[in-house]
Amino acid sequence: MGNRHAKERSHHHGFDADRDAKKLYKACKGMGTDEAAIIEVLSSRTSEERQQIKQKYKEKYGKDLEEVLNSELSGNFKKTALALLDRPNEYAARQLQKAMKGVGTDEAMLIEILCTRSNKEIVAIKEAYQRLFGRSLESDVKEDTSGNLRKILVSLLQASRDEEDTVDKELAGQDAKDLYDAGEGRWGTDELAFNEVLAKRSYKQLRATFQAYQILIGKDMEETIEEETSGDLKKAYLTIVRCAQDLEGYFADLLYKAMKGMGTDEETLIRIIVTRAEVDLQGIKAKFQEKYQKSLSDMVHSDTSGDFRKLLVALLH
């Protein structure tokens, strides 16, 4: 959906990579920077069009647009502009690498990205990771995580979630029973049974399984996971369950959490708005409005400032 909106905008006077490249060149040359022109071009083009603009810029001016913006801009505005110049899967790959490099691992980031993507997105992210860093994403994840979290992430990296649109009622009942036997129905939890179901079944099938579970046990799946698991594994399982139930709602909640209370988690705002822009951002906006009785644009507007605010708000329109 988001794609259609971006497309509509870029066609109101025809997309022209050459003209956009010139506009960006003019915005950055000489003293000072014309931020408004940069915002206008970056926010009104699709990801594919921005790739063409980058190419055109390099041909005409013999420079990488990223390098130019990197030296001209600063702060969160710069981060967002550079994120927009990456293909979404490259950007996700960079975020994963950042989550793992150096001391310590940002498990929450690994979970947010790997537990929310479709097979096709996972495959594209793995390819981008290999291309950008000359390493296998799977072996880096294996090295940087351990125990049951490692198992579920590696399962997800196989990109073997069923994508059939039909629901097998019998399988849902069987899976619900297996999940009961693996969790509530025994001492300790058998994570392999959870992984098998959570990483392999389609979202539609999972919803049927959670319903069957509710009927069988009289408890919802989230409650069981809260009781039976802990730490990062719990976070990963809950993320998959929430995404299966309502992917757009899951991202709406993350955005809300990034802004509510004191301080703002700008990194999360950038990551979600940029990566979901051409996937389901319109749906996320609608879900945000429904859940929190306020518009996402308004909340972003009151929680950010300057050119960063202008760029995010432009991306949300």
From Swiss-Prot:
- What domain notes does the record hold? A pair of annexin repeats may form one binding site for calcium and phospholipid.
| UniProt gene name | Anxa13
Organism, as annotated = Mus musculus
Know the name of this protein?
Annexin A13
Q: Which cellular compartments is it found in?
A: Apical cell membrane; Cell membrane; Cytoplasmic vesicle
Identify the stretches annotated as Annexin repeats. 15-86, 87-158, 170-242, 246-317
Task performed by this protein: Binds to membranes enriched in phosphatidylserine or phosphatidylglycerol in a calcium-dependent manner. Half-maximal membrane binding requires about 60 uM calcium. Does not bind to membranes that lack phospholipids with an acidic headgroup.
Q: Which Pfam families match?
A: Annexin
Q: Which InterPro entries match?
A: Annexin, Annexin_repeat, Annexin_repeat_CS, Annexin_sf, ANX13
Coiled-coil region list: none
Lipid attachment (N-myristoyl glycine) is at 2
As one GO molecular function, the record gives: phosphatidylglycerol binding
- Give me the Gene Ontology terms describing cellular component: apical plasma membrane; cytoplasmic vesicle; nucleoplasm
Query: What SMART domains does this protein's entry cite?
Result: ANX
What protein family does this chain belong to?
Answer: Belongs to the annexin family.
- What is the membrane topology here? Lipid-anchor
Q: In which tissues is it expressed?
A: Detected on the tips of microvilli in small intestine (at protein level).
* Entry keyword annotation includes Membrane: yes
